[in-house]
């Protein structure tokens, strides 16, 4: 069977950026990596209801700058900034360096692969039919402006005895085109029948010369007049 490379990993340095940016060597590298993993796990657990898509970690000169990309910034910030200040104190203690937290709002959650996967998984946990959940998410993404989207669910769908995989796609999802801006992410739905995996690919357009290039249909070539 053909295997697929991770769509984000293959595009790093081309159209995608790393989510952890720092330099270290030897034992320091392992320590930084472990703390990054622990920080992400802590934040994802703490901010479950805040629709967090991505957490970027930068470490400039004995400090840490954490950027939280969320569709619901009000939940992260809290009343008068109390929640985000408590988060900052906890992370400073956990990471052992002064931490600065930035919050970036996601304006179009329908075009974010992680948030779409979370939404489909939550619907599956509420016993919504998987085909309906997939179709609704695909239609919303295409309406907002996606060039293409594919959603795949795997597991005991509808409580079936035998696990299977189903998928739904609209538009183009060119996995081999390295300049294609493809947002990919996964999430798990924990149902009474077991775990159902959700994968989402969203094609937003091609990045040419460092900017987003809108894909427009090519005009048909003019017809040649027949010689008399």
UniProtKB/Swiss-Prot annotation:
GO terms for molecular function: mRNA binding; rRNA binding; structural constituent of ribosome. Keywords: Ribonucleoprotein, Ribosomal protein, RNA-binding, rRNA-binding. GO terms for cellular component: cytosolic small ribosomal subunit. It comes from the Bacteria. SUPFAM superfamilies: Prokaryotic type KH domain (KH-domain type II) (SSF54814), Ribosomal protein S3 C-terminal domain (SSF54821). Gene3D superfamilies: 3.30.300.20, Ribosomal protein S3, C-terminal domain. PROSITE patterns: KH_TYPE_2, RIBOSOMAL_S3. Residues 39-107 form the KH type-2 domain. One of its GO terms (biological process) is translation. Part of the 30S ribosomal subunit. Forms a tight complex with proteins S10 and S14. Belongs to the universal ribosomal protein uS3 family. NCBIfam families: rpsC_bact (TIGR01009). Binds the lower part of the 30S subunit head. Binds mRNA in the 70S ribosome, positioning it for translation. PANTHER family: 30S/40S RIBOSOMAL PROTEIN S3 (PTHR11760), SMALL RIBOSOMAL SUBUNIT PROTEIN US3C (PTHR11760:SF19). This is Small ribosomal subunit protein uS3. It comes from Pseudomonas entomophila (strain L48). The lineage of its organism: Bacteria, Pseudomonadati, Pseudomonadota, Gammaproteobacteria, Pseudomonadales.
């Amino acid at each position: 069977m053909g295997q697929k490379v991770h769509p984000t990993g293959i595009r790093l340095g081309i159209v995608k950026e790393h989510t952890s940016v720092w330099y270290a060597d030897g034992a320091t590298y392992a320590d930084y990596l472990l703390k990054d993993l622990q920080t992400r796990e802590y934040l994802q657990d703490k901010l479950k209801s805040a629709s967090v898509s991505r957490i970027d970690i930068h470490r400039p000169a004995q400090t840490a700058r954490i950027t939280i990309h969320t569709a619901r910034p009000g939940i992260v910030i809290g009343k008068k900034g109390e929640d985000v200040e408590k988060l900052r104190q906890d992370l400073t203690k956990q990471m052992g360096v002064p931490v600065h937290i930035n919050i970036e709002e996601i304006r179009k959650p329908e075009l974010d692969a992680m948030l779409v996967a979370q939404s489909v998984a939550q619907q599956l946990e509420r016993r919504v039919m998987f085909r309906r959940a997939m179709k609704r998410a695909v239609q919303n993404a295409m309406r907002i402006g996606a060039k293409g989207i594919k959603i795949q669910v795997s597991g005991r769908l509808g409580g079936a005895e035998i696990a299977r995989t189903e998928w739904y796609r609209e538009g183009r999802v060119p996995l081999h085109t390295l300049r294609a801006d493809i947002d990919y992410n996964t999430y798990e739905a924990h149902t009474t029948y077991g775990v159902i995996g959700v994968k989402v690919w969203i094609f937003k357009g091609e990045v040419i010369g460092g900017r987003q290039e809108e894909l427009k249909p090519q005009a048909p070539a003019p017809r040649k007049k027949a010689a008399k």
